[in-house]
């Protein structure tokens, strides 16, 4: 969720979304520049559901079941980041629609978006499933003590 105006609609969207996922800038704007961990837990405590933030090359952080998790992505040569967020959200939704767990969906989305950033060309830079499935093995999920 990119929320650069901090509109009141964002609270309604969060309430109604099954899996709200923010961009780093969107989360900072929405929660008035709190550190991302505190912001995620505040939203989780308000909604009692999964909430995440994408942080580019620093990966993805999320809270579910009152625990903080991190999906670390490998360092890659970035060529183009345009639409990386859209690719992430689309891949995440696709994985959820296939009844994947939240963690599996994060892995799939992070791998897909990371690979997309390694090429230019809009829709033509979205990687093939076989490439994503190999690349997923390079990603790591960690439960963070908080």
For the regions a protein language model found, what residue spans apply to each?
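Conserved phosphate-binding/catalytic region of the ribokinase-like
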Residues: 36-146
């Amino acid at each position: 969720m990119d929320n650069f105006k901090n509109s009141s609609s964002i609270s309604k969207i969060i309430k109604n979304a099954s899996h709200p996922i923010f961009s780093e800038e969107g989360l900072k704007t929405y929660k008035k520049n709190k550190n991302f961990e505190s912001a995620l837990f505040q939203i989780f405590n308000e909604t009692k559901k999964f909430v995440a933030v994408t942080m580019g090359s620093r990966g993805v952080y999320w809270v579910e079941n009152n625990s903080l998790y991190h999906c670390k992505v490998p360092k890659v040569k970035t060529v183009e980041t345009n639409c990386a967020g859209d690719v992430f959200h689309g891949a995440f939704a696709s994985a959820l629609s296939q009844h994947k767990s939240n963690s599996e969906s994060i892995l799939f989305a992070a791998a897909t978006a990371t690979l997309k950033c390694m090429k230019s060309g809009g829709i033509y830079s979205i990687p093939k499933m076989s490439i994503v499935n190999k690349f997923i093995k390079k990603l790591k999920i960690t439960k963070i003590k908080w």
